[in-house]
A protein has these predicted regions:
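The feature captures the beta-strand-to-loop junction immediately N-terminal to the Walker
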Residues: 42-44
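Helix-to-loop junction immediately C-terminal to a conserved catalytic motif
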Residues: 57
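ABC-type ATPase nucleotide-binding domains, specifically the catalytic core motifs of the NBD
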Residues: 61, 101-118, 130
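Conserved ABC transporter NBD signature motif
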Residues: 65-76
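Conserved ABC ATPase "signature" region
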Residues: 115-136, 188
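Conserved ABC ATPase signature
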Residues: 140-144, 148
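A short, proline-enriched helix->beta-strand linker immediately N-terminal to the Walker B motif
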Residues: 159-163
Length: 306
């Protein structure tokens, strides 16, 4: 079963651990993501959401385990993975257009930049048009609203043509009205470009509204390793839900179905409702995981596949 899932996957994560000293942050993470998915990731504060994102980006490497992008091991950060943070990654003294061109300027050899000057300029303008900033090319960051700055940051990533766009709480610093408009903008952009997006957020409403799939990461769970508190446990994927991919509008947040899903995810994060590893809510068709024998004691088994 795992081989067939692996063949369908753009991003493949298997038996991944991240340990700092004696602290286990990520504990045997298994994840498969296919091209074109918009995956949202939620979980309690400090559970390792941003750590997982840094591993995919290549800023850090797993202590153990395998991570593949299009079948190749993930190495140091490169243009195959774009990143947008909560803090705007803009150069203050460059225009909007100059900021978007900065990535190619820093990554390409001088002669290639010179040869492709018009092509790169056209590409920068194209992506700024995609993020609705075609009329703001000559403005500087201090002249832009928070939402506009984040759209510039997204265009900075897009011009590098990443296979996957990673977003770490990108709308967290925006006011509620701007945040909502940016959510709608991101959905339009995702549908237009067919991008693969991995979106980390602490906001359950945002995660359910945006995602085609929502993953819950948590270190609050039960297994067969003894009493909690006596065994160092890191975070696992405790839930993996497929979400509706029908046309979304702000009105979708007002439906009973939306509210029920929010409540279901909220209960999964709530430490008062810990689940045993064998009962994790892994509903997505690409969900899979392996467990060590000490986590779930099955006679004669060293791994448990589901």
């Amino acid at each position: 079963m795992n081989d067939s899932i692996k063949e369908k996957s753009m991003l493949w994560i298997e038996d991944v651990y991240k340990i700092y000293g004696n602290k286990v942050v990520l504990d045997d993470i298994d994840l498969a993501v296919s091209a074109g998915e918009l995956v949202t990731v939620v979980g309690p504060s400090g559970c390792g959401k941003s750590t997982l994102l840094r591993l995919i980006l290549g800023q850090e490497f797993p202590t153990r385990g395998s991570m593949l992008l299009d079948g190749k091991p993930i190495g140091f950060a490169d243009p195959t993975r774009g990143i947008v943070y909560q803090r705007y990654s803009l150069f203050r003294h460059r225009t909007v257009l100059g900021n978007v061109l900065e990535g190619p300027r820093l990554s390409l050899p001088f002669m290639e930049r010179r040869r492709r000057k018009k092509e790169l300029l056209d590409e920068a303008k194209h992506f700024l048009e995609k993020v609705n900033l075609a009329s703001d090319l000559d403005k500087y960051p201090h002249e832009l609203s928070g939402g506009m700055r984040q759209r510039v940051a997204i265009a900075q990533s897009l011009i590098m043509k990443p296979k996957i766009l990673l977003m770490d709480e990108p709308f967290g610093a925006l006011d509620p009205s701007t945040r909502q408009s940016m959510q709608l903008f991101l959905l339009e952009l995702w549908e237009d470009l067919g991008m693969t997006i991995f979106f980390v957020t602490h906001d359950l409403h945002e995660a359910v509204f945006l995602g085609t799939r929502i993953i819950v990461l948590s270190h609050q769970y039960l297994d067969d390793r003894g009493e909690y508190g006596h065994v160092e446990r890191g975070a696992k994927i405790i839930a993996d839900h497929p979400l509706s991919v029908t046309a979304k509008s702000v009105d979708a947040k007002k439906t009973a179905e939306f509210g029920e899903l929010i409540e279901e995810v909220r209960l999964e994060i709530d430490i008062r409702h810990k689940k045993h590893v064998k009962d994790f809510n892994l509903k997505h068709p690409l969900s899979w995981r392996t467990l060590r024998e000490e986590e779930h004691r099955l006679t004669g088994a060293t791994k448990y596949d589901s």
